[in-house]
Amino acid sequence: MKTIEVDDELYSYIASHTKHIGESASDILRRMLKFSAASQPAAPVTKEVRVASPAIVEAKPVKTIKDKVRAMRELLLSDEYAEQKRAVNRFMLLLSTLYSLDAQAFAEATESLHGRTRVYFAADEQTLLKNGNQTKPKHVSGTPYWVITNTNTGRKCSMIEHIMLSMQFPAELIEKVCGTI
């Protein structure tokens, strides 16, 4: 077994082709390259991988639900997420990531998300402040959205749950994400 270094983008692409838990990188690459261990010696594999790599990087235009799930799992395992000491910071990072995965679905989810007397998301800070001076609005990084942040962790979880359900994430992932806030 040899070790090779790949950049993050290529790693993510290869990981996005995982078919089952525990599948090795070698198995994934063999399947992607339609290569079997018995058919050719090791040297041509290296050549084949190098030729195929540029095509792999370019062939990543649309995010499927599997890609979105993988991206959320990668976020939960990331150092950036682990370094967040406060629930509000994890909440903000989750919102930013969800938006980056599918801006349209995120927009649709947030439009239907509001409390009895409160608006949770808006395009500007003033709209949120109109619904209460103590809402502590914060801008969601990388998005046109502002969100109120003076809610308890349970409310933050239910907001994330609503958005993820609307974006058609699997229930077990939603539960896992909410458990980390």
From Swiss-Prot:
Pfam families assigned: SeqA, SeqA_N
NCBIfam families from the UniProt entry: PRK11187.1
Coiled-coil blocks: none
Stated family: Belongs to the SeqA family.
Subcellular location: Cytoplasm
Name of the protein in its database record: Negative modulator of initiation of replication
Keywords carried by this UniProt record: Cytoplasm, DNA replication inhibitor, DNA-binding
GO cellular component, one term: cytoplasm
GO molecular function: sequence-specific DNA binding
